A protein has these predicted regions:
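Hydrophobic ligand-binding cavity/cleft-lining segments
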Residues: 1-46
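Short beta-edge strand/loop motif at the mouth of beta-sheet-based domains
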Residues: 14-15, 34-71
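Hydrophobic/aromatic beta-strand elements that line small-molecule binding cavities or substrate pockets
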Residues: 17, 49-52, 74-80, 104-113
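A short, structured loop/turn motif at beta-sheet edges
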Residues: 23-24, 53-55, 79-86, 110-119
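Hydrophobic pocket/interface hotspot
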Residues: 26, 36, 60, 78, ...
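Helix-adjacent hinge/juxtasegments
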Residues: 59-90
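Short, solvent-exposed aromatic-acidic interface loops
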Residues: 92-96, 123-130
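A conserved amphipathic terminal alpha-helix motif
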Residues: 127-158
Length: 158
């Protein structure tokens, strides 16, 4: 199943790019802490900490830092992991399946090979229309787009 086959949901925000990079390199950048730190936050923000256990039920913690030093942690769990093809994660739970105070989204990232290229799709499914609108107003397309550029640049060097 490709990302295009997934049913659209009214509360989805989606970014899709056809990249001249093999899927395995993109997947590494999404799963290896040292690589995540190099691309996951839109510049001038940075990633100060990554702690992840990439398996279904495994935890994820990524802390982004503003240029002024403000830290913004994002934690959750992986729901589905298909190496080099698909990652599904949510912030509805934290480590140990503890319910989060305020769930915001579920991320579905796919890496679909197309010849020598990869169709990269980041789909963010929100719990409700208000959360979707808030994320879009925060700059989803600009921020995730910039991060995708940073991801592609890093993956091309691997």
């Amino acid at each position: 199943m490709t990302a295009q086959d997934l049913p659209e949901h009214a509360n989805d925000l989606v970014l899709t790019r056809l990249l001249d990079i093999p899927a395995d390199r993109l997947y590494r950048c999404w799963t290896e802490p040292a690589l995540i730190q190099q691309w996951f936050a839109p510049s001038p923000w940075s990633v100060s900490r990554v702690d992840n256990d990439v398996r279904p039920g495994g935890h994820s913690l990524i802390v982004m830092r503003s240029p002024e030093g403000q830290e913004m942690p994002g934690s959750g769990v992986y729901l589905e992991v298909i190496p080099t093809r698909r990652l599904v994660f949510t912030d509805a739970f934290t480590q140990g399946w503890v319910p989060a105070d305020k769930p915001f989204m579920t991320g579905i990232v796919t890496f679909d090979p197309e010849g020598s290229q990869t169709r990269y799709t980041a789909r963010v499914r929100h719990w409700n229309a208000a959360d979707r609108a808030q994320h879009e107003a925060m700059g989803f397309h600009t921020g995730w787009g910039q991060c995708t550029d940073q991801l592609a640049e890093l993956a091309a060097r691997l």
